[in-house]
Amino acid sequence: MDRKTRLSEPPTLALRLKPYKTAIQQLRSVIRALKENTTVTFLPTPSLILQTVRSHCVSKITFNSSCLYITDKSFQPKTINNSTPLLGNFMYLTSSKDLTKFYVQDISDLSAKISMCAPDFNMEFSSACVHGQDIVRESENSAVHVDLDFGVVADLLKWIGPHTRVKRNVKKAPCPTGTVQILVHAGPPAIKFILTNGSELEFTANNRVSFHGVKNMRINVQLKNFYQTLLNCAVTKLPCTLRIVTEHDTLLYVASRNGLFAVENFLTEEPFQRGDPFDKNYVGNSGKSRGGGGGSGSLSSLANAGGLHDDGPGLDNDIMNEPMGLGGLGGGGGGGGKKHDRGGGGGSGTRKMSSGGGGGDHDHGLSSKEKYEQHKITSYLTSKGGSGGGGGGGGGGLDRNSGNYFNDAKEESDSEDSVTFEFVPNTKKQKCG
């Protein structure tokens, strides 16, 4: 009986569990928040790279060869999604303290075979590879290079934190995304951080801040991205490097590293918008160039609207001087009119046909019988607030003189099912104390 030839193992990349667990525990709070927009790349260097892509920001965590080893240099790079079916956050699973074995095998160009082991548990699965995923690389050419001590990073987090919290039950319209402007001065060397509300924090050269390359520059980035960047770098509790790269587009590079892993963040510049407090030239000339978009613009539009309908002289002045009561502007219905006004309410500006309160002139010539017949027909339209002058679209032809008649308690329904109340007229007028 011939002995079968043992097949050679495919190229395998595995974790050195002791250093990897030390590194992953520091990053556990960051990895827990990773979502679908994160990929995991295994390289034959060996290294393991997590890359998260957000709007105007790319974050990268690289585990170096201190945490990994490889059996064969022919191992082909593999990139998979961090969010996997049934498992959820893949990298968060590897942060478990119960993990006893983890390795990736190169058996196909289209997938990666992954094995994870724990006491009394073994799991193997294949995950489809993601193709065409580029890894962002650091550029050595930078116009500004500043090293910040961990204490400076902590001060920035305390300063920015209250401005990034989402306020609940805010009645105002949502505001644009907040930004932070970073100014670098060459003489004397200084770096200043300015928020949208005008609050600023400045650091000069000392034992906490070191300037290796200085140039007068300004960059504007999203506040939430910058805050998350500082949180990512703070896990090392080591100095943080801040650089401004201007090779193709202006880019803010923020990184921190230790002996096991490196945290890198690439923030693209947020374009300056009109109305930005940082754009002082626009703020100073906005009223001259655009004519204003606030209160003055609305007043002029009302005046122009009054001029389009030639309803008589001084209409726009009447509109501006009229108190915005129940009648309102146009079609409100009687709240702004007087008791004996022939217009019958605040409808159109014409006198021939009134559309707001409506029908004030037609009730004067009706007899009591006709009023009673009309009341029987329109009694279902009667509201308890009828004496107030009619609500939104006219009160069914009622004015202030006839409102008391329709709301008289003696004219309530006499059916057996209804509840009747005795009406005692009070001749005395109530006086307001």
UniProtKB/Swiss-Prot annotation:
Organism listed in the record: Human cytomegalovirus (strain Merlin) (HHV-5)
Location of region: Disordered: 274-433
Entry GO CC: host cell nucleus; viral tegument
Domain of life: Viruses
Keywords assigned by UniProt, alphabetized: DNA replication, DNA-binding, Host nucleus, Host-virus interaction, Inhibition of host innate immune response by virus, Inhibition of host IRF3 by virus, Inhibition of host NF-kappa-B by virus, Inhibition of host RLR pathway by virus, Isopeptide bond, Phosphoprotein, Ubl conjugation, Viral DNA replication, Viral immunoevasion, Virion
Biased composition annotated in UniProt, kind: Basic and acidic residues: 360-376
Localisation: Virion; Host nucleus
Quaternary structure annotation from Swiss-Prot or TrEMBL: Forms homodimers. Interacts with host SMARCB1. Interacts with host NCL/nucleolin; this interaction is important for the organization of proteins within viral replication compartments. Interacts with UL112/UL113; this interaction is necessary for efficient viral DNA replication. Interacts with UL84. Interacts with the uracil DNA glycosylase UL114. Interacts with the DNA polymerase catalytic subunit UL54. Interacts with host IRF3. Interacts with host RELA.
Start-end of Gly residues biased regions: 325-336, 344-359, 385-398
Record's keyword annotation contains Ubl conjugation: yes
Protein family per UniProt: Belongs to the herpesviridae polymerase accessory protein family.
Domain remark in the UniProt entry: The C-terminal region is required for viral DNA synthesis.
Entry protein name: DNA polymerase processivity factor
Role according to the record: Accessory subunit of the DNA polymerase that plays an essential role in viral DNA replication and acts by increasing the processivity of polymerization. Forms dimers that binds to double-stranded DNA and UL54 specifically to stimulates long chain DNA synthesis efficiently. Plays an important role in maintaining the structure of viral replication compartments by interacting with host nucleolin/NUC. In addition, suppresses innate immune responses through effects on host IRF3 and NF-kappa-B.
